[in-house]
């Protein structure tokens, strides 16, 4: 274990700092974790995931979440990432007295870089674009009159795993970059 000689510099928290508010939903977040688990253990990635699936019950996600040699804050329940370059995480109380796992941006960056290396080897421009080009299927059509319609569009009960994973990954990458540039924490809000 490495002990720092000096404390970390505080970051500024006020209502004047810019903020970033985009986030994936649980289906997309779970798809990203599933791709991470499948690629880590060299297993095939399922082509689809069910709508509202309970991703924590998937055997490969559960295996990676408990793997003592491969520790990812994303799989250990982190909900806060502090703007620190070192990679570590810990459990601590929030101001609400709820306990949460708190990690660092340095650790999140390493995890996201590892996932990209395992799954896609995409450059940053491609990654940033996935939030706009990947994700959920269209839930409606734009008619000739310019009106949006859901007529004749079946409800989706399955989603493309890779597309959802890329969508979530892009949002996490964007949040991480923003947090690094602005020196602000990332907080998952659910």
Residue ranges with predicted function:
Residues 4-182, 190:
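Acidic (Asp/Glu-rich) sequence patches and key acidic residues
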């Amino acid at each position: 274990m490495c002990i720092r000689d000096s404390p970390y510099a505080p970051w500024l928290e006020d209502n004047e700092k810019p903020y970033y508010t985009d986030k994936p939903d649980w289906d997309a977040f779970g798809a990203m974790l599933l791709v991470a688990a499948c690629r880590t253990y060299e297993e095939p990635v399922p082509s689809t995931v069910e709508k509202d699936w309970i991703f924590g019950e998937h055997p490969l996600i559960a295996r990676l979440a408990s793997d003592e040699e491969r520790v990812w804050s994303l799989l250990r329940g982190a909900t806060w990432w502090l703007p620190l370059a070192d990679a570590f995480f810990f459990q601590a109380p929030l101001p609400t007295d709820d306990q949460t796992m708190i990690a660092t941006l340095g650790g999140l960056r390493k995890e996201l870089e590892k996932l990209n290396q395992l799954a896609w080897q995409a450059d940053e421009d491609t990654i940033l674009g996935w939030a706009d080009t990947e994700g959920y299927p269209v839930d409606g059509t734009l008619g000739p009159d310019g009106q949006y319609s859901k007529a004749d569009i079946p409800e989706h009960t399955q989603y493309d795993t890779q597309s959802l994973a890329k969508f979530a990954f892009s949002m996490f990458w964007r949040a991480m970059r923003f947090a690094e540039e602005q020196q602000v924490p990332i907080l998952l809000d659910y």
